[in-house]
Swiss-Prot record:
Protein localization: Secreted
Residues making up the signal peptide according to the UniProt record: 1-18
Record InterPro entries: BACK (IPR011705), BTB-POZ/Galectin-3-binding (IPR051481), BTB/POZ_dom (IPR000210), SKP1/BTB/POZ_sf (IPR011333), TRAF_BTBD17 (IPR056184)
Single GO cellular component term: extracellular region
Organism: Xenopus laevis (African clawed frog)
Keyword Zinc-finger: no
Annotated ranges, domain BTB: 53-122
UniProt keywords, alphabetically: Secreted, Signal
Residue stretches making up the BACK domain: 161-261
Name the UniProt record assigns to this protein: BTB/POZ domain-containing protein 17
Amino acid sequence: MRMKGLYVVPLLLALVESAQKSDLGGDASAALINHSPMLIHRLQDLLQNSNSSDTTLRIRTANSNEVKVIHTHQLLLTLQSDIFEGLLLNQSEVTLQEPAECAAVFEKFIRYFYCGEISVNLNQAIPLHRLASKYHVTALQRGITEYMKTHFASESSQGHVVSWYHYALRMGDITLQESCLKFLAWNLSTVMSSNEWVTVSDNLMVSLLQRSDLVLQSELELFNAVEEWVSKKNPDVPVIEKVLRAIRYPMITPSQLFQIQKKSVVLASYHNSVQDLMFQAFQFHSASPLHFAKYFEVNCSMFVPRNYLSPSWGSQWIINNPARDDRSLTFQTQLGPSNHDTSKKITWNALFSPRWIPVSLRPVYSESVSSSSQSNRLEEGKPRLVMTSAMSGMDFAGVTFQKTVLVGVKRQQGKVFIKHVYNVHQSTDEVFDFLLNADLQKRTSEYLIDNSLHLHIIIKPIYHSLIKAK
């Protein structure tokens, strides 16, 4: 990818452009003659012409005798980097020690100072970001961060988001850390089946397992993936115990719990570490949640479902040509994860409107208002999604329902990646600000895959503590 834009234009050209605009004033006959592309081309030629340079950079790498020599110009380096300004004070030749991966892209990094443009691929993102951070080239640092945040879903043989997270952690880049964590959490099933999974660090694994917004098929899938990670990474015993205790066993069916008790090698070795949680899970499945809540604390993460994609928790909804008209969907979910409620289902109705306008803002029809202006007002409406229970008369004592909507925005190798997650407050049926900035009219919209809107609705029961039985 080639990064180019105003935020990476060299300071020299920005100052020239500002002066030119000032010269025009308000004269209607004035015109701007723009030869900045020619200037950029000539600046790039300077980098190739060592005869005109006034500065020499020598790039060395550890455990190597190779030295890369780059002839540059002090003015262009110091305009954008206070680090170079300090290094080149009263000297024209500097030797720099860089890791091999940074040395490999150093000439590309220097070329950026001459043209304000740089091409980036997945493998080069970290070394270029490291150089931009080290030499305080702020605009380039921001640009590469944005590149990374928009390329999480890009195809990569070994995966790259986990390594980007670990890099952001070392650099103290909180924004990039959170963006990486969010992508990993929302696309965990894909990550768990990739080569990246075994590269997850102990701390990252613990951080992920503490989250309730993980998107995956089931809690059993998560347990199996964690067991694989433990077997291949062989972390310290406290880490193994911590990740095993982060599994939400009540979200696994009794038959599946019996199965992992019998077949799991890791669980057999660390059964004592989770014995209390397994016993509590079987108790949870043996009684009604209402009765269970009288004796046990259910207002904790162990009893909060994650974003499970299996049919009993919700429904996929692919809306073709979503800008065309209103659509509706009816689906069923289980009342809750407790085995006691296996046979109990709830029916839900979902309504999607591509251009909804609140009644209070709708124009009152009259003969004085043209039909075209009424039509234009409708075009100004925003997408709306409402989800309601078709069984509102039922008594759901001790439980409310968290509605979550996943929006898939990109497909790689036939897989839809989740980029947007909307959580609906338990007291309402509407998803506020749903696709607020989406243009569903454009076939190239990032929200559409083959002109279809890919949604997945998840209904999660949230249990509430009741008065304890004496």
